[in-house]
Amino acid sequence: MIRSSIKNKITTTKSLSCISLINRQYGTSTKEVRETFLNYFEKNGHKRLPSGSLLPYNDNSLLFTNAGMVQFKNQFTGNEESKYKKVTTSQKCVRAGGKHNDLDNVGYTARHHTFFEMLGNFSFGGYNHFKRDSIQHAWDLLTKEYGLPKERLAISVLEGDEESAEIWRNQIGLPNDKIMYKGREDNFWSMGDGPGPCGPCSEIFWDHGKEVDGERYLEIWNLVFMQYNKSGKEGDEMPVDKLPIPCVDTGMGLERMASVLQGKFTNYDIDLFQNLINSFKEIVTMDVGRAQFQLQQDPQRVETAYRVIADHLRSISFLISDGVIPFNIGRGYVLRKIIRRALSYGKILGFNGPFLSTLFPLLEREMGDIYPQLIERSNEIRNVILNEEGTFYNAIQRGIPYLEEFVQQNKLNEESLFLLYNTYGLPLEMSQVKAKQNNIEIDMDKVNKLIDETREQSRLTWNTSSSSSDQTTQQTTQLPEKTFLSWKSDNIKPKFIGYNGCVENDNSKVLRSHFDNDSHLVYLSLDETPFYGTSGGQVGDVGELINVSSGKNVYRVINTIKPYEGGLVLVVEWDPSQQLASQVYQDLKQDSLLNCRVDRSIRNQVAVHHSATHLLHAALRNVIGKSVVQAGSLVGSESLRFDFTHGQKLTPNQIEQIEQWVNDAIAKDIALNTDEIPYEQASKNSDTLQLFSEKYSELVRVVSIPGFSKELCGGTHVERSSSIHQFKIISESSVAAGTRRIEAVAGLAATNFFKNHYQLVHQLSNSINSPIVNFQQSFERLVNTNSKQEKEIFDLKLKIAQLSSVNYNGQYKSDNGGEMIPLSLHIIDCEDKKAFTKVTENFAKEFSSSPIQLTISKGGKVLCQLLSSSSSSSSSLSADTVLKQLFKSIGMGKGGGNKLMANASIQPLNNEILNSILNWSNVNNNYNNKKN
């Protein structure tokens, strides 16, 4: 029996030498490994379920799904009952960012990935004996289905878990020298540091054999026996309670298992990765210049680059397909970081421009049959990648001159690295390499701290700016989270009865109530209610409650929320000037009977905007293409907001087509259909739109407008399309790279929109003394007249500026060896920005023989601009540097720019300031001896 930690023995090997353990090229393909696993458990009574989204549903504790059990978290905790007692899945996982972050290791180790698939089987009380059955299943699959030699397998158990050890020894027949004991750090699993299900685990290892140099054992499967509930805090020695029903959670890395079955020592040598990498190599070597460049690089560095790009292309594509868009915070920031890391490694292969988007079809070909959303969202994925590539290379082009300047001035430090990253978007890796090349030490912890502080501030600002809500649902008080957790634990799940136009219900019973006297709010859960809770982008209902017994006190429902899955809570406001707290308590306490009255007019307008949102979504996909994916929405009574993936601003013609498409559907007076069908059935219909970031129940509601739209939706809608009346887009804008936003109005809100605009046009017509029918012609005449007058004024300003100009020939003394460079100095009397810019352009042409052109206005608000000719005798000459030298000499100035142009301001000119400028410019003649 082995009772040592063997921490150094049982690890993922770091060696890159490939030893053929099973003498075949690939043998079992990765697809066959996946299918064999799922099919085995299906044959043994498990329900095969699709992979969950990479975006954990309603779980802010995780950036991304990083394990197979994430989508079953509520079943493990007991907060949700599973329809199936035994389940098997192949789960998409991403580990990049947050606690589980493999990003920096990817490409350098044998098995680290940002994206991988986790094969798993799960039992929620479905096994006769949870340990015995799960161990037997694992052994049979490995030795009989996969055909692995028994003598090449070893296992570990938790020290003290003799029950598991006995099963391996007596039931499976594993010899003692193959059973290894490990501590809680390695063989006890929990969902986190806080309360939750947990238990010992048994890991299964593939033995590479003693002849392998370096580490010997590779973990291929982890069997977790969740039999306890941890109710203590972090640091507790042992769990305190047994779960009423022990569960099983197992995880096997697909790529890792494929490497064993294919006799490969690293995951990157399996068929899936080699197919991608070899295709990449063909593309790279098609360009002679790139091929020659690659031959000059370190071969190991080149191979690492191929691995990084192959891995990152997978995580990038799957994240985008699940709705993540590159952004500056949160999940979008991680995606952006992965894309930029891949592009940085592309430079090693000779790529100096976008290339990732052209590689995506290779992944689509390799994995599209298993994950059809790669095919369905192909255009969107490629467009998002291409847009981000453009952003990246623009950032490099913008930031490199500043990086070079910081190096030349010995100012490359933590603050300047942060500035280059935060202001100009230059990747940290590029600045780090430059620092290393110049023997400059950088404290990256300090840089990362600056980034984290800025990101947190951005997150707070973003949360504030993106949390706009309908006026009927504004909630400014702190919600009683502990109360809601208690209600959730007590399984308080009200029944919603508000479909089919139902807005009233008598004798609803109060199941739970929470009184907040400070805010004069009461939170109620009723047994059944017509009030719809905020979800799916739709705002919650408002209305009134009346106590059945008293029949007189009316309470205003200001919001309806869903604080937990299955929960439905009415937020009720009471007026202390009109109602006594004791009476409120008596009327709304537990077991009270209430008459519910939803505000019908607001409900109807919300329904109008929700149905209009479905038509808008369909119209976008019809006009722009199937690559459009919903990225967010807000449906209120006054308007709707719809965010969608698209890399370009919509043209006026596209907006007009979208509006016309929606209004045509409205005019056809189509009856809406709602059906409840199994999710499995709905998900197989490619015409039915769904959000991959949403978690759907076994039974889903399908809302369809025949011939136009079909979506999974739990919201309220109109009965016929004609009830929407009319639809109008009021704005289209960008909310992030690759994400656009449309704001629109429908129904009564659209009528009011047109009414208000008519009144505005009427007022404007009166102000220019024109009949409203002739307003357009009158307005155009007014605009034309104004344009002519503005041009005349501009020409006069330009003429005055040119006539007043005082021009000097001077010299600039550079820092580089004191070289004297010709300089033209121009003093003008011009405060108009447009005229000032035009004058400087004229000077640049007229005095082109001088590499440096310096123009300064002298009156009022001062503008200073520096133009630097590209024909300069000094390649290191920078307009920004020249300007800063001027500031230093005259003791004032604020501004900056780049190598070719810089803008600034100083104090209004007087003789003293002017003479200081002339002295710095090495001009011999003074102000009175000007040279025109």
From Swiss-Prot:
The keyword Zinc applies. Its main location: mitochondrion. Its EC number is 6.1.1.7. Keywords: Aminoacyl-tRNA synthetase, ATP-binding, Ligase, Metal-binding, Mitochondrion, Nucleotide-binding, Protein biosynthesis, RNA-binding, tRNA-binding, Zinc. GO terms for biological process: alanyl-tRNA aminoacylation. PROSITE patterns: AA_TRNA_LIGASE_II_ALA. Zn(2+) binds at residues 610, 614, 713, 717. The keyword Nucleotide-binding applies. One of its GO terms (cellular component) is mitochondrion. One of its GO terms (molecular function) is tRNA binding. SMART domains: tRNA_SAD. Consists of three domains; the N-terminal catalytic domain, the editing domain and the C-terminal C-Ala domain. The editing domain removes incorrectly charged amino acids, while the C-Ala domain, along with tRNA(Ala), serves as a bridge to cooperatively bring together the editing and aminoacylation centers thus stimulating deacylation of misacylated tRNAs. Catalyzes the attachment of alanine to tRNA(Ala) in a two-step reaction: alanine is first activated by ATP to form Ala-AMP and then transferred to the acceptor end of tRNA(Ala). Also edits incorrectly charged tRNA(Ala) via its editing domain. This is Alanine--tRNA ligase, mitochondrial.
